A protein has these predicted regions:
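Sequence-structural signature of the catalytic-core scaffold of metal-dependent phosphohydrolases
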Residues: 1-49, 57-99, 110-157
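Short active-site segment of divalent metal-dependent hydrolases/proteases
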Residues: 104, 108-109
Length: 157
């Protein structure tokens, strides 16, 4: 793919997918790759992982998932690159790279968040890179978009 010629406008969905979010209100997704990543098995797994581990046992309102958090990070990254001076320095291919990296940044998290990592001496960042570059649905989607795109996204992590 010619990175310089890639245009986000040309690949937009005709109808954006809208996610209702407790923090950001509405999160619009209009890029097919982003929507495909959201629908992947690896991203959907994050719906069952609490953002704050076992904290919800003490604070009943601390119920949000890694999935919701990842959508929120995607939303903020998207807002930054389209509504600020930062975006002026990025071409559309770079913008999509940033949005994918933001969405996938926590995909390697296990149950009970960082407590699990501490107990078993694991690193979610390393698992995130393994998921993005390994034999996964996420990897296949990124590579289908453009050969080498999975490594480009993981290099941002």
């Amino acid at each position: 793919m010619n990175q310089a010629a890639y245009r986000l406008e040309q690949t937009k969905l005709t109808d954006s997918k809208v996610f209702r979010d407790a923090v950001h209100n509405y999160i619009h997704v209009d890029q097919p790759l982003i929507l495909d990543l959201i629908n992947s098995h690896e991203m959907q797994r994050l719906r069952r992982i609490k953002q704050l581990g076992g904290t919800h046992q003490v604070y009943q309102s601390a119920e949000h998932s890694r999935f919701c958090h990842s959508l929120g990070v995607y939303f903020i990254a998207r807002k930054m690159i389209f509504n600020s001076a930062i975006g002026a320095y990025l071409n559309d291919y770079d913008k999509l790279t940033v949005m994918c990296a933001a969405l996938l940044h926590d995909i390697g998290h296990g149950p009970f968040s960082h407590c699990f990592e501490d107990a078993f001496d694991l690193n979610h960042e390393a698992y995130t890179i393994k998921i993005i570059n390994g034999k996964t649905e996420v990897h296949d989607l990124l590579e289908k978009f453009d050969h080498g795109f999975s490594h480009r996204v993981s290099s941002v992590m």
